[in-house]
A protein has these predicted regions:
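Bacterial Sec-dependent N-terminal signal peptides
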Residues: 1-10
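Proteolytic maturation boundary segments
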Residues: 9-44, 132-209, 213, 221, ...
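M16 family metallopeptidases and their MPP-like homologs
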Residues: 35, 40-69, 75-136, 187-209, ...
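Conserved short beta-strand edge segments in small beta-sheet-based binding/regulatory domains
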Residues: 544-550, 644
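Short Ser/Thr-interspersed hydrophobic loop/turn segments at strand-loop and sheet-helix junctions
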Residues: 702-706
C-alpha cells in the first residue's frame, strides 16, 4: 500500500454497488451476487467460490459426481449443453480459496439453468467454509434469489467468517535474478517485478485502491515512454514494452507491478543497463511535469474510450464479484470508477510531488525486486545480468529525459488555405447519421453519439495495397506501417506521435486490399488540430530512413516473438489455403525490401490526390454546426480528382481439398501454450445478408459440437470466424485447440496430447455437413445473434467499420438484418455448413 495521499474521511466511504448487481446472504450463510447483464442474450456465467478450498483431488471429484447428478456426471452435463472449459478447466485455486467457473451456460433452456443452480448448491454442501454463489448474465435476479432461498434449505449452516487474514507483508531486502530459456531465435524478455504490501480489507471498498491503480497506470506510461525514447536513441531494438499491475483485488498475495521489455538477445546486457538507469533516475529525480501531464492525458483518453474501466462482460462481472467476496473489493459501477480516475480536483503542480513520492516508495534497486530474464540459450546467465542491473542503478543516469518542446508544438502543421461549401446532406442508412457532400466532392459522415468529450474518426481512401508500385509477395502486410515512419510537417515520426499524444489524440494508419485508413480518437476540443494533422499527413510527408531501419530491427523481433501464436498460425493457414495470394496478412521480415518506404510514398501520393474517392467519418461528442464550419474551413485544402483509378484485379483462388501439417513447438515466446491442434476451413460463398446470418448460426453450431467433442480430452478452444468480400467473397472458420491445466479438470479427465485432440476435432470438422441442429438451439442461436447485432450497433468502432466496408467495397453488413434473421431456416444453415465442408481445409498440429 504505497499511496501517499491523505483523504478526507467522507472520501473513504464505500463506493456503493452498481445498480445491475444484487447481493445478499441466504439463511444458511451462503452469500450471493446476481448480475443482470443482457449483453449476451440467453446465456449466463455461474461461479461458486469458497474461502477455504477442499483438496484439489476432492474439488475435481465433485465434477464427477454429486447427490443430484447420479445419471450423468456434472462435467458431462455441461459438455452436452455447450459449456466448455477455459484454459484452467472449470476450477482454480486462489491462495487457500477455490473457485469454480462455468461460462456461457444456456439459460434460454430453463432446465439447464435450474440444474446448474442445483449443481452449485450440491457443491456448496461439500464444505462448511464461507461460500458465495455468483451468476452474471441474462437473468431475473428476484426469481433467481427465490430459487436460491428454496435450494439453500438443503445446505447446512456455514461457518461464520473469521474476519482475520492470514496475510503478512514480508519485505525482501535483496533482489532476485531469474533466467529462463525460451525457444525464440533472438527475443529476450527482460522483466522487473516489484512487490508491495496489500491494501487492508477495510479500505478495499474505498477510493484508495482506485487511485493506487491510477497512479500505477501513470507509472507504467512514464516508464514505457522513457524506455521507447531511450532505446530508440541508443539504437537498441525494442519489439514491445509492457506494464501490468496486479492490485489487492487480483489475488491473495502481494501487490505486483511488472515492467517487461522485449529486445534482441544480442542487446540483453546493454538493454538491462539502460533499463536500470531509467528506473534509477525516476527513483532519484521523479517524473517531469511535461511527461506527467502527458501521461494523465493518455490515461483520461484510455478511460473515456473504455480501454480502462470499460464495459464488463459476464466473465469480468464474475471476477469482480469473486474479488468482492474474497478480498472486499468494490462493486462500484464503471461510471463511478471512471469518475475517480479522471477527476481533476488537484492541480498538476500539487499532484506531481505526490506522484513522485509514490514512485520513490515503489522503486528500489534491491528491495522487493525480482528480475526475470527470458532469453534464448545463448550463454547469458542471471548473475551477470543482475550485476549489470545493480551497477547501472548505482551509477544512475546522466541523460536528459525532458520532453522536447515540439512534443506539444503544433506551429509547423499544415494550415488550411482554401475553403469549401456544404453542397448536400442526406440521411446515411447504415449508421443513422448524416452524409454530407462538400463542393469539392469530399464526403463526410457525421453522427452524434452518447460519448462524452471525445469522438472517433476515420479517413478512408479507396484503393488498396495492390496499387503499391512493384509490390512483392509478402510485403503488403507492412504497407500500413509505413505511414507512421514518415516525417510529417517537419516533425520526425516520433515527435509527431508525441505531439498527438500530448494533445490526447490517437492515430493509426492501415492499408488493406480495398482501401487505406487513418483512424483514432480525439478530444472534442481538438477537432481543428486533428483536421490540421490529417491535412499535414496528406500534404507534407517525407520518408525517414533512420526510422525505417529501426522499425525493421524491431519488427523482426516482433515477428519472432509472436511466432506460432494463434493469430500467427491462423494467418499461416490462410496462406496455405490461398497459395497464389499475393497480399497475405502474414508478415515475412525477409520479404521486406529496403525501398518499400519510397514505393509506398508513391502509393500514398496517389491516394491523397483523390480524397474525394473516400469518406471521412466523425462519430461522437461533436456539435453539428461547429463541425460544419470547421470542415468548410479545412476540406478545401485536400486534393481531389475527377477521375478515379480502377481497382486492379487480384488473384486469391482457394486451393482444393485438405492438407495436414505437424510441426514441433517453437520458436516464439508463447511459452508452450502454442502446443495443440489448429484447423481452418474456407469456402467461396456469395455475400448477402441471408448467407451472413446463416454463417453466424453455423459457427454457433460448430462451437457447441466442439465443446462436446473436446470435454473428455481436457482441451479448450477458440473459434474465429472471418467473412471477406474482396478480392473474393468467402467465409472462413479458424479453430485453435490447446490442453487445459490439469488441476482444473474433472478427476477422470486428463489433458490430452495434440494427436488425441486431433481425432476429436476431426470428428466434428469432418462431419459439419451433417451437424445436428435442434429447434431449441436454432431459436436460441437466432436470439443470441439478434442481441449481438443490437449490441454491435451501440459500438462506435463496429458502426464505423460497417460504414467503411459499405463505401469501400459496396457491401452492406447492416441493412436487412432483421428480415434475414426472420427468414433463415435450419436447412439454410445446413446448406452453408455443407458448402464449408466442400471447401479448402488445413490442419496444423503443433507438438
Amino acid at each position: 500500500m504505497l499511496l501517499p495521499i491523505m483523504m478526507h474521511s467522507q472520501v473513504l466511504s464505500s463506493l456503493g454497488v452498481a445498480k445491475e448487481i444484487t447481493k445478499g446472504t441466504l439463511p444458511n450463510g451462503v452469500e450471493y451476487f446476481l448480475v443482470q447483464n443482457t449483453s449476451d442474450k440467453g446465456f449466463a456465467d455461474y461461479a461458486l467460490v469458497r474461502t477455504a478450498s477442499l483438496s484439489i483431488e476432492d474439488e475435481r471429484k465433485s465434477l464427477c459426481g454429486l447427490p443430484h447428478f447420479t445419471d450423468r456426471k456434472p462435467w458431462q452435463f455441461f459438455s452436452e449443453h455447450g459449456v466448455g472449459y477455459s484454459s484452467y478447466g472449470y476450477y482454480t485455486e486462489e491462495g487457500s480459496a477455490g473457485v469454480f467457473r462455468f461460462s456461457n451456460v444456456p439459460v434460454y433452456n430453463q432446465s439447464v439453468a435450474d440444474s446448474t443452480l442445483l449443481m452449485l448448491v450440491d457443491m456448496t454442501a461439500l464444505s462448511r467454509s464461507p461460500q458465495a454463489v455468483v451468476v452474471s448474465g441474462d437473468i431475473n435476479p428476484s426469481k433467481l434469489k427465490e430459487r436460491l432461498n428454496l435450494l439453500s434449505m438443503t445446505v447446512p449452516q456455514l461457518d461464520c467468517p473469521s474476519g482475520e487474514s492470514s496475510y503478512k507483508w514480508v519485505q525482501k531486502d535483496s533482489k532476485r535474478s531469474i533466467l529462463i530459456n525460451n525457444p525464440s531465435s533472438d527475443v529476450a524478455a527482460i522483466s522487473a517485478i516489484i512487490s508491495s504490501a496489500r491494501t487492508s480489507r477495510e479500505l478495499m471498498d474505498s477510493p484508495q485502491p482506485i487511485v493506487t491503480s491510477m497512479y500505477a497506470e501513470l507509472v507504467g506510461k512514464v516508464i514505457s515512454d522513457r524506455v521507447r525514447r531511450e532505446f530508440r536513441s541508443r539504437g537498441i531494438p525494442l519489439a514491445d514494452v509492457e506494464f501490468s499491475y496486479a492490485g489487492s483485488d487480483a489475488g491473495p498475495s502481494d501487490e505486483r507491478y511488472g515492467f517487461t521489455l522485449y529486445t534482441s538477445a544480442k542487446y540483453a546486457n546493454v538493454a538491462t543497463d539502460c533499463f536500470a538507469r531509467i528506473l534509477s533516475d525516476l527513483d532519484r529525480n521523479g517524473a517531469l511535469m511535461d511527461e506527467f501531464v502527458d501521461a494523465k492525458a493518455q490515461l483520461s483518453g484510455d478511460v473515456r474510450s473504455g480501454r480502462l474501466a470499460g464495459r464488463l462482460d459476464n466473465a469480468a462481472y464474475v471476477d469482480k464479484c469473486v474479488s468482492a467476496f474474497l478480498y472486499g473489493s468494490n462493486l462500484a459501477s464503471n461510471e463511478v470508477i471512471a469518475g475517480l480516475m479522471t477527476a481533476k480536483n488537484i492541480a498538476p503542480e500539487t499532484e506531481l510531488p505526490l506522484f513522485n513520492s509514490f514512485i520513490s516508495a515503489l522503486l528500489d534497486g534491491e528491495k522487493n525486486l525480482t528480475l526475470r530474464f527470458n532469453v534464448p540459450d545463448c550463454g547469458l546467465d542471471a548473475e551477470s545480468l543482475g550485476t549489470t542491473f545493480s551497477e547501472a542503478w548505482k551509477e544512475g543516469s546522466d541523460r536528459d529525459y525532458s520532453y522536447k518542446k515540439t512534443f506539444s508544438d503544433t506551429l509547423s502543421l499544415y494550415a488550411p488555405k482554401s475553403k469549401v461549401k456544404l453542397r448536400s446532406e442526406i440521411k446515411e442508412p447504415i449508421s443513422g447519421g448524416s452524409l454530407w457532400t462538400f463542393s469539392n466532392g469530399i464526403r463526410v459522415l457525421y453522427k452524434k453519439t452518447a460519448a462524452r468529450g471525445e469522438f472517433h474518426y476515420s479517413l478512408m481512401l479507396r484503393g488498396g495495397v495492390a496499387s503499391v508500385p512493384d509490390i512483392h509477395s509478402g510485403e503488403s502486410a507492412f504497407v500500413g506501417d509505413m505511414l507512421s515512419l514518415d516525417n510529417i510537417a517537419g516533425l520526425n515520426p516520433y515527435d509527431f506521435k508525441a505531439m498527438l499524444s500530448s494533445n490526447g489524440i490517437t492515430m493509426k494508419g492501415s492499408a488493406g486490399i480495398s482501401d487505406m485508413r487513418i483512424s483514432g480518437i480525439a478530444p472534442k476540443s481538438k477537432l481543428r488540430l486533428l483536421l490540421r494533422c490529417l491535412l499535414s499527413v496528406s500534404e507534407s510527408r517525407v520518408p525517414d530512413r533512420d526510422a525505417f531501419n529501426y522499425y525493421k530491427q524491431c519488427e523482426a523481433l516482433r515477428i519472432d516473438m509472436e511466432s506460432l501464436s494463434a493469430r500467427d498460425v491462423n494467418s499461416l493457414m490462410d496462406s496455405i489455403m490461398r497459395p497464389e495470394y499475393f497480399f497475405t496478412e502474414r508478415k515475412y521480415i525477409e520479404r521486406l525490401e529496403d525501398d518499400l518506404p519510397e514505393r509506398c510514398e508513391q502509393y500514398f501520393d496517389a491516394q491523397f490526390a483523390k480524397v474525394n474517392d473516400g469518406l471521412l467519418v466523425l462519430m461522437g461528442d461533436l456539435d453539428e454546426e461547429h463541425l460544419k464550419k470547421e470542415l468548410c474551413r479545412a476540406l478545401g485544402s485536400f486534393h481531389v480528382m475527377k477521375r478515379f483509378a480502377q481497382r486492379p484485379a487480384v488473384n486469391s483462388r482457394l486451393a482444393s481439398g485438405a492438407v495436414s501439417y505437424t510441426v514441433e513447438s517453437g520458436p516464439g515466446l508463447v511459452g508452450g501454450s502454442e502446443i495443440g491442434v489448429n484447423v481452418a476451413m474456407a469456402a467461396p460463398v456469395p455475400y448477402n445478408m441471408e448467407n451472413q446470418v446463416a454463417f453466424k448460426i453455423a459457427t454457433s453450431c460448430i462451437r457447441k459440437e466442439l465443446v462436446k467433442a473436446l470435454s473428455d480430452k481436457g482441451a479448450f478452444f477458440e473459434l474465429t470466424e472471418k467473412l471477406e468480400v474482396f478480392p473474393d467473397e468467402r467465409m472462413s472458420v479458424f479453430v485453435n485447440c490447446h490442453p487445459c491445466i490439469e488441476s482444473g479438470l474433472p478427476a477422470d479427465v486428463s489433458a490430452a496430447t495434440p494427436l488425441d485432440m486431433l481425432s476429436a476435432v476431426r470428428k466434428v470438422m469432418g462431419n459439419i455437413a451433417t451437424m445436428p441442429l435442434s429447434k431449441e438451439d436454432f431459436n436460441a442461436f437466432k436470439e443470441e445473434l439478434q442481441n449481438d447485432f443490437q449490441e454491435s450497433l451501440q459500438d462506435t468502432e463496429y458502426v464505423i467499420d460497417a460504414v467503411l466496408i459499405r463505401y469501400a467495397e459496396g457491401k452492406d453488413f447492416v441493412t436487412g438484418f432483421k428480415e434475414a434473421l426472420k427468414s433463415v431456416t435450419p436447412e439454410k444453415v445446413r446448406s452453408l455448413l455443407g458448402t464449408l465442408a466442400s471447401g479448402a481445409s488445413v490442419e496444423y498440429i503443433i507438438i
